[in-house]
């Protein structure tokens, strides 16, 4: 039995254990039927030809978790933002962990999605926002919609600015083999509201602290979908940290719908994973909208990360800014495919798109394709990409100043990515990412971390 057939046959059993919301049930049923028609993508699909997704679609993968694994705080504390208070939604192997989470319904709803789907109180919100902006022809989005249950639900009311950031933390315990996880996040910011969200992926095994290890273990495939709705004048800073085990894979689909005068920024930091695919989609539906996408990718060994971005300008007087940096060592590979669409009605658009890549390894490679589709005539749009290596003259200069070659390469590599990092508004998060970068580069950068 193929993985596709196995998942389709698992759907009825999943629904028996799911919530009773009729709208969500209809969405799941339609999604699994559409997934059954189109199946998984392969290299014949234009948007997947550089990403070998087939190699992680193991037939042994299952959506059913056998048991809940309890993890000691000492083993996961470094995964949290340190030094500040935060709301937390912690998922261990795709299951909500109330012990390490910190949720609230005071002033805002920050809780687990399954509790909302099961509660009639939220039926109007679910009917209005859930599954409204996803691509219904994208295989992994359909699969997530078929099995969506656990994840984060965040609803910030009108004119509320959250007093502390929100963390969504996915932890792979290593306690079960062959899991295919389907976390689903629904984020709603009402008119004039403001929030900061940090979503991260980690593995206990990769940090040598998993209490579970056994022969024949198959790493999980995490298929995440996030829907974000920003009403007028809302403001969101959204950060993604993907620092998982080198053999663990992540498919991340994020859809952001913005109303007039709203601002959304999304920073993606891809540091770990076997196959990582990020589909980031912004839909601008109103005037004076600002959309910001920035990312840093640092890979080694045989890792592969694929960034696909879309900004759809459907209204005039809006801006979008994309800047992605990639650093590839050993035999790692990367993809950047960025697309900006400007409708005919969307005059006075200012759109910028840039992808710069540094090949540190002799056998590393990257495929990059920035695109513009412009149907309006009064716009200011630009795009570009570069692929290169470390500047030999700069490296020589640092060595003449008594800096060892390894440290000199580390300093130049850090400087290459630094301007993206400097746009992180949360100091504690910026420090955390600096530490990860220093570890990935493998040198002491001399910063006070």
What function would you assign to each model-found segment?
Residues 1-142, 326-329:
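N-terminal amphipathic, basic helical "cap/leader" segment at the start of enzyme domains
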Residues 48, 411-412:
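Residue-level "edge-of-site" marker
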Residues 99, 103, 109, 113-403, ...:
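Conserved beta-strand/loop scaffold segments within soluble protein domains that form the structured core
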Residues 15-18, 420, 424:
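Short amphipathic alpha-helical interaction patches enriched in hydrophobic/aromatic residues
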Residues 40-42, 413-423:
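Short, surface-exposed loop/turn segments at secondary-structure boundaries that line and modulate
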